[in-house]
Structures are given as structure tokens and as C-alpha cells.
A protein has these predicted regions:
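Charged, solvent-exposed interaction patches on well-folded alpha/beta domains
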Residues: 1-18, 38-47, 51-58, 62, ...
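Extracytoplasmic "Venus flytrap"
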Residues: 22-23
């Protein structure tokens, strides 16, 4: 197509692809279509070259369940969107009953009304609140914030569990004790296992495996 010819090509279709490779369904194709329509513009029939791709890309990426959105147009008049979802690693219930996720990047992620991820759950003496912590990443927390937050150690333990297939299938609950120590609760049996801090996790779980 010459540039003059492509200017005349109308938007004929909208193609949406959501990456579900992590087995998460926080965002569906219908959700993305709703995000597009919420901008209030009628895409179909509009000249494909005049559609503000960046505006739509930023709008979709602003969804708290979206990690990244790629928006582009094709010469045949297709407006295409590919969405990558954030991947939760742990669901946290704080002392006040509020709930949120930690994702694999260490960022706070709100829960969804339509989907619940199958990840370990942390509860107990956790004072962290979503509205206070959502702008932080546990990997870059200051030392003073780590002193009062439990999220950095919970993230470290949840990451360890996720990357070890044996423990990933056996541990679905973590409890923060009044003194800040961590206890894991296996899916089978009626026993609680005190881990303490996250120091030397590899060694602690190796001993647990031998036991």
C-alpha cells in the first residue's frame, strides 16, 4: 500500500489476544473489548492510520491486572491488541481481613471480582494495607519499611515455594506469627511447620524433605 492508499483503509475488524500461558484469567478478550469501547470512540469504519494507538495502549495497560499491552494496526484494516497479564505468586490476607496479591515481580496487585488465582495464601499478623503499599515493590523497599512490613519475607518464601515443584504442590498456606516468624501449613496432614525467618531457606526445606 502507498501511504495515500493506506490512509483510506477503514478499520474493518478488531483482533484481541490475551496471553494465558501462566494459567491466569484475570483478563479475558471480552474485558479488553470493554476497555476499548470505554474510550467512547467507534473504531470500525475509522481510517486505520488515524487511530491513536498509543492512547489505547496506555488505557489498556493501566488496568491493574495487565502487565503489558501491545496495540498495532495492520494494512488490511485490522486493529490488533495483545495483552500480557500479571502473574500473582501469593494472596495476602492482612490482620483487618483485606486481601491482595503479590505478583512475581514483587509488586502489589489487587484482587479480582471475577477470578481467583490458585496460589498460596498468607495470613496472620500482617499489618500491610493495600492502599498504603500498592505503590511499592518489595524488591526495592527501604530498610526502614522492611522493618515494619512482612511482605518482603512473604515474597521471598512464596518465590522459593513456586520454584520448587515439590513444595509448590504441598504448601498452600503461610502464617505470620505474632513474633513475625513464618509457619507453613501443608495441604496434607494436620501439622504446622515453623520456618522462622527466610534465612537459609534451601537448607531448612532440605531438612524438612529428609524429615
Amino acid at each position: 500500500f502507498s501511504s495515500r492508499e493506506s490512509d483510506k483503509v477503514p478499520c474493518r475488524d478488531i483482533s484481541i489476544q490475551v496471553d494465558h500461558s501462566t494459567d491466569n484469567f484475570f483478563v479475558t478478550e471480552d474485558d479488553v473489548m470493554d476497555m476499548i469501547l470505554s474510550k467512547g470512540d467507534s473504531l470500525k469504519g475509522s481510517p486505520i492510520t488515524l487511530i491513536p494507538i498509543g492512547v489505547y495502549e496506555r488505557h489498556i495497560s493501566a488496568n491493574p491486572s495487565v502487565k503489558r499491552a501491545e496495540v498495532y494496526t495492520k494494512h488490511n484494516g485490522v486493529f490488533a491488541v495483545k495483552v500480557y497479564q500479571r502473574e500473582p505468586i501469593l494472596r495476602v490476607f492482612n490482620s483487618e481481613g483485606q486481601s491482595f496479591y503479590l505478583d512475581v515481580e514483587g509488586s502489589i496487585m489487587p484482587t479480582s471480582k471475577s477470578y481467583t488465582a490458585r496460589v498460596p495464601v498468607a495470613m496472620g499478623y500482617i499489618s500491610d494495607k493495600l492502599f498504603e503499599m500498592e505503590r511499592y515493590n518489595v524488591k526495592t523497599m527501604s530498610a526502614s519499611l522492611k522493618d515494619i512490613s512482612r511482605l518482603d519475607e512473604l515474597f521471598e518464601l512464596a518465590t522459593f515455594i513456586k520454584t520448587h515443584e515439590r513444595w509448590k504442590s504441598q504448601i498452600q498456606q503461610i502464617r505470620v506469627e505474632p513474633n513475625g516468624e513464618l509457619t507453613v501449613i501443608p495441604t496434607v496432614g494436620d501439622h504446622h511447620i515453623l520456618i522462622g525467618s527466610t534465612d537459609k531457606l534451601e537448607l531448612k526445606f532440605k531438612k524438612l524433605h529428609l524429615f
